[in-house]
């Protein structure tokens, strides 16, 4: 089992200084690197003080310039909010300047509130279709010239500039909590991120059973790595009386 860190710039309201929020967040990423964590993950969310992450690739660029070894992951880039040419190029540029440390996570998006602002008219429950169109397009753009005429995006012959350092592309992770997405990830050779967060661990066990069913149904594909996010409390003392409560989302990779 390996451990990863998923952390956001967070505050309850604008009474807390953003410089302090940023300092604390970077300190935690640097501590994770020194502690042997394998990946630091940045989210994408919009207009939420509790998850300040308007562009995960910008956040990871910042972390890349202040770390040396830890790998850097998007958890996740929300497909419906991006154009494929834009996302392919930005992700590849991060892979370049980080020395090939990108772990590319893509997903459907979590909150209807955000879709109402970022993609009006799109139901969160339908956004998986954008993700499933987007991912194959990204792979083709990273590989070379490609023209696309799809349900959600169309563009003439284009390519990713630059190309990723990692060949044929960075490791790809798909956010999955349903059988249709587990199936898609397995068939496309992707690793998997699941978010039980703080719910009973039975939810993680349910996701694992769905993943196992997908693996069994699609023989001949590589077995994906599965990372599970759990909110984890970290203390600086074994004495419960002196606990300073701090909860961080931590991924366990199995």
Locations of regions flagged by a protein language model:
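N-terminal beta1-alpha1-beta2 module of alpha/beta enzyme domains
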Residues: 1-72, 167-170
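Flexible, glycine-rich active-site loops centered on histidine and acidic residues
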Residues: 1-18, 80-148, 192-194, 198-202
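Hydrophobic faces of well-ordered beta-strands that scaffold small-molecule active sites
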Residues: 3-7, 40-42, 72-74, 102-106, ...
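Generic structural signal for well-ordered alpha-helices
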Residues: 25-29, 57-61, 88-92, 132-139, ...
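Acidic (Asp/Glu)-rich catalytic clusters
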Residues: 60-68, 95-101, 186-187, 218-221
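Conserved, mostly hydrophobic/aromatic
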Residues: 63, 94, 138, 172, ...
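Short, conserved secondary-structure transition motifs
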Residues: 230-239
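Conserved small/polar residues in nucleotide/adenosyl-binding loops
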Residues: 244-250
């Amino acid at each position: 089992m390996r451990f990863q860190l998923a952390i956001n710039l967070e505050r309850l309201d604008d009474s807390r200084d953003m410089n302090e929020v940023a300092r604390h967040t970077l300190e935690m990423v640097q501590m994770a690197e020194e502690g042997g964590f394998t990946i630091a993950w940045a989210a994408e969310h919009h207009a939420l003080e509790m998850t300040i992450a308007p562009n995960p690739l910008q956040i990871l660029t910042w972390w890349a310039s202040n770390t040396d070894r830890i790998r850097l992951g998007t958890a996740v880039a929300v497909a419906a909010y991006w154009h494929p040419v834009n996302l392919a190029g930005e992700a590849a540029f991060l892979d370049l300047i980080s020395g090939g440390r990108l772990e590319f996570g893509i997903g459907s998006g979590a909150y209807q509130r955000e879709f109402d602002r970022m993609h009006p008219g799109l139901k969160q429950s339908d956004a998986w279709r954008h993700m499933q169109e987007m991912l194959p397009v990204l792979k083709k753009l990273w590989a070379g010239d490609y023209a696309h005429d799809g349900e959600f995006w169309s563009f003439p012959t284009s390519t990713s500039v630059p190309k990723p350092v990692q060949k044929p592309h960075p490791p790809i992770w798909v956010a999955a909590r349903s059988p249709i997405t587990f199936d898609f990830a397995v068939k496309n050779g992707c690793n998997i991120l699941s978010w039980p967060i703080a719910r009973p661990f039975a939810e993680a066990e349910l996701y694992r059973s769905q993943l196992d069913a997908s693996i069994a149904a699609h023989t001949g594909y590589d077995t994906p790595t599965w990372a599970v996010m759990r909110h984890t409390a970290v203390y600086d003392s074994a004495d419960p009386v002196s606990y300073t409560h701090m909860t961080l989302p931590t991924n366990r990779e199995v």
